[in-house]
Design a protein with these regions (language model features):
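Generic N-terminal amphipathic, Lys/Arg-enriched alpha-helix
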Residues: 1-31
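Residue-level recognition of alpha-helical structural elements
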Residues: 10, 32-36, 237
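A short, well-structured juxtamembrane/interface segment
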Residues: 31-49
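Glycine-rich phosphate-binding loops that contact phosphosugars or nucleotide phosphates
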Residues: 48, 55-225
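Internal alpha/beta core interface subdomains
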Residues: 225-228, 232
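A short, charged, Gly/Pro-tolerant segment at domain boundaries
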Residues: 233-248
Length: 248
């Protein structure tokens, strides 16, 4: 049996992570449920009419995109646009992808859109914690330019703190018709651990454990539920994806 020292007030124990996560879940439910419902209805309207919802996220935001498109319990009418495809097609190099260069380049979004069969009845969900990088902002602008609705999943606190890297000077929430705020902090960290890099505990400690991913995934699942509810209300069977690892 391991004898643990009692945690200090700012120590990043698993229990602290659970507590912070619970607060964020409560905040999302209280402040964003109506926005999520609005977004779900807007997307469902397009899907029920035969449209596709295109989902785009870069970096760790792609984890949220993957919760919406191409997974068990999700909807087949949601398709993901991925930067990795630009490496496969030799439009970009693997280094561009790994070092984060691609997500800063507006032309990367343009290249993905050019290669996709986007229709006049489609819609977009663009996910970006910071909301400032060139590719997500360009993706939203290209969709708006085609007259397509855009739902953003982003941190308004972070986005309002930083300048856009897009030539337009716009951030994602300033382009999207509907913006769902994950509530993730500017640092995107949930808890503080020990002394800070420039001083003792008063300096704030080391930020660990991201917020944007688990908050974004919760938003993605809530969006899916809203859309499925719209299908059922319309008397239409939702095009759900089932796990390929089930024996039926």
């Amino acid at each position: 049996m391991i004898d643990h020292e009692p945690p200090t007030a700012n120590q990043a124990t698993a229990d602290n992570v659970f507590a912070v996560a619970a607060r964020h879940v409560s905040r999302l439910r209280e402040h964003e449920a109506a926005v999520i419902a609005q977004a779900g209805h807007a997307l469902a309207e397009r899907m029920l009419a035969g449209g596709t919802v295109w989902v785009f996220g870069t970096g760790h935001s792609r984890a949220v995109a993957m919760e919406l498109a191409g997974r068990a319990g999700g909807l087949s009418a949601m398709k993901e646009l991925v930067l990795e495809d630009l490496v496969v097609s030799r439009w970009a190099t693997k280094d561009d992808l790994v070092n984060g260069e691609l997500e800063r380049r507006p032309e990367a979004a343009a290249a993905l859109v050019e290669g996709a069969a986007i229709g006049a009845g489609d819609a977009f969900v663009v996910i970006s914690h910071s909301g400032c990088n060139g590719a997500p902002v360009e993706m939203a602008l290209l969709a708006v330019g085609r007259g397509l609705p855009v739902v953003a999943v982003t941190s308004l606190e972070h986005s309002r703190t930083v300048r856009s890297r897009h030539p337009s000077g716009l951030r994602l929430f300033e382009v999207a018709a509907i913006s769902i705020d994950t509530g993730a902090p500017y640092s995107d960290t949930a808890v503080r651990l020990g002394p800070g890099p420039e001083g003792p505990e008063e300096a704030g400690g080391l930020g660990v454990c991201s917020v944007s991913t688990f908050a974004g995934i919760l938003v993605a699942q809530a969006l899916t539920a809203e859309i499925v509810g719209c299908y059922l209300h319309a008397g239409v069977a939702p095009p759900l994806l089932m796990s390929r690892n089930m024996h039926i």
